Amino acid sequence: MRKRELAAFFAHAAHETTNGGPGAAGGRYAWGLFYTEELGCADGHCKVYNTGGTSPYKPAPGKSYYGRGPLQLSYAYNYGLAGAEMGLPLLANPELVSHDGVIAFKAALWFWMRTQAPKPSCHDAICGKWEPTTEDRRSKRTPGFGMTINIINGGIECKSNDPAIKENRGDRIGFYRRFAGLLGTTVEPDCDCADMAPYGN
């Protein structure tokens, strides 16, 4: 199970930061950890992430909370909560997640391990420690890699039939299978979230 979890974490990190494509040397799944920030969000773009939602963590003036680091930590409420729990000024200085490798991985591991109800943590979902509620079962949310997709980006990727979105999910799954093979472990038969309802829907 530990190897499967490592494969899952590496798969999402590689997908979120890759610079590889179908014609890349070694194949698309040989790439990852290239980009440290979400593309197209510099210079004040991607304001959609500048929300604290109902959390106490509101955006700092002049700062932007787009995806940064191996798992592309996004939204002011995630930067604020991660910073508070790790003792780092991430709400005031979100760029630390892309400029400091140690902080980048701390933030990624924080997100991976942190339950944010009603979502379980990625760790619990992939390790089988999460027990789906009646609502989760009704929404076809089950433990495994597909559930980690749902936790990370389910609102966009799960239950979508858009070809580009399906390709994104397939890319995550391709990385997962590659890393599982490299680590000498297997993956579950259904790694997708195609039938799962995302949270909030």
Predicted feature residues:
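Sequence contexts marking disulfide-bonded cysteines in secreted/extracellular proteins
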Residues: G40-K47, H123-G128, E157-K159, D190-A194
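Peptidoglycan-targeting cell-wall enzymes and recognition modules
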Residues: E5-R114, R141-G144, T148-I151, I156-C158
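Short, well-ordered loop/turn and helix-capping segments at boundaries between secondary-structure elements
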Residues: Y79, R114-P118, L182-T185
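Alpha-helix N-cap/helix-initiation motif
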Residues: M1-R2, V97, I165
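Surface-exposed patches in mature extracellular/periplasmic domains of secreted proteins
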Residues: M1-L6, P22-G26, K119-K129, V187-C193
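Extracellular low-complexity, O-glycosylation-prone Ser/Thr/Pro/Gly-rich "stalks"
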Residues: E131-N201
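Mature extracellular or exoplasmic CAP/SCP-family domains and secreted bioactive peptides
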Residues: K106, R114-R141, N150
